[in-house]
Amino acid sequence: MERVAKLSTEKAVVIFTASNCPMCHTVVSLFSDLGVGAAVHELDRDPLHGRDMERDLARRLGRSPPVPAVFIAGKLVGSTDRVMSLHLAGKLVPMLKAAGAIWL
């Protein structure tokens, strides 16, 4: 969907979430703790486009619910499991630096 593609490039890190999703909160908190000013889009709070974006993300991720869905430098990284795996392997911070999301 065009809207997800457009929004996913608005900042170095973009996270699609739902307001009632505990794992979404965890992922957003992780990026915040790392000093990333991510763009966060809560799909359930967008009455005009939320459902369409949710379907598009479910198709891209191959699962439902599709949140959280994390994009770094406009590329879909994945959901909680993928983000946490990258972080534990020491690969997330270099990705964020390369994307210009953090400078330290």
From Swiss-Prot:
PROSITE patterns, per the entry: GLUTAREDOXIN_2 (PS51354)
Species: Oryza sativa subsp. japonica
Family: Belongs to the glutaredoxin family. CC-type subfamily.
Organismal lineage: Eukaryota, Viridiplantae, Streptophyta, Embryophyta, Tracheophyta
Location in or out of the cell: Cytoplasm
Domain Glutaredoxin: 1-103
Gene: GRXC15
Protein name: Glutaredoxin-C15
Xref: NCBIfam families: GlrX-like_plant
Matches recorded under InterPro entries: GlrX-like_pln_2, Glutaredoxin, Glutaredoxin_subgr, Thioredoxin-like_sf
Top-level taxon in the UniProt lineage: Eukaryota
Keywords: Cytoplasm, Disulfide bond, Electron transport, Redox-active center, Transport
Disulfide bonds: C21-C24
One Pfam family here: Glutaredoxin
GO cellular component, as recorded: cytoplasm
CDD domains: GRX_GRXh_1_2_like
Function, as annotated: Has a glutathione-disulfide oxidoreductase activity in the presence of NADPH and glutathione reductase. Reduces low molecular weight disulfides and proteins.
Classification via SUPFAM superfamilies: Thioredoxin-like
